Amino acid sequence: SVIRIDDRYLAQRNIPKSKTLAGKRIALVGCGTIGGYLSDMLVKAGAGSCGGKLTLVDFDGLLPQNIGRHRLGFPDLLSNKAEAMAKELKRLSPGVEVHALPVDVRQAQLGKLDLLIDATGEESLGHWLCGRYRAPTPMLSVWIEGPGTAVRALLRTNASGACYRCLWQSHRRGELRSTIDALPNILAGHGCEGLYVPFPASVSVQ
């Protein structure tokens, strides 16, 4: 018997009545806590297949303190996150077209996109991306709030819809909150390690 293993079949098999990301030009900015896992899921949804292209953008390296909640592990320690994730995705799905840009996204040339994803969790950079890549380029912003209390996302599909800046302005006024009570301000780490917000790796895939 013949067993299908082509990219289109693998992307559509589990969601036969839904559209996939096959054939789309997608850029993922930030390959950290969220972006690492998200890039894996994007490929499983068809990104980088059937003529499409997935571009990973991150200038940061994978450090020892990242290992506990990152998609990558010790074999990629001290490697650039975008390059290491691209290598891992190609290992898992040899047919996909995945490119790494180990640079600050403000110096990157991403070209025309079908979807831009901001997974950096940095408010100021999110505002810059919204201004640089205006509608009609669809943009998905994803971030973790507090010590893993909530994972939020905002999809901008047109110029008249809600934008990232609007959401943050509402957030400062206490509107559109993810929780009824204020988010706790919890920090961990000391000495040479530096401070960080503690939450488990499972938060990144909620």
Predicted regions and their residues:
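Conserved S-adenosyl-L-methionine
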Residues: 45-53
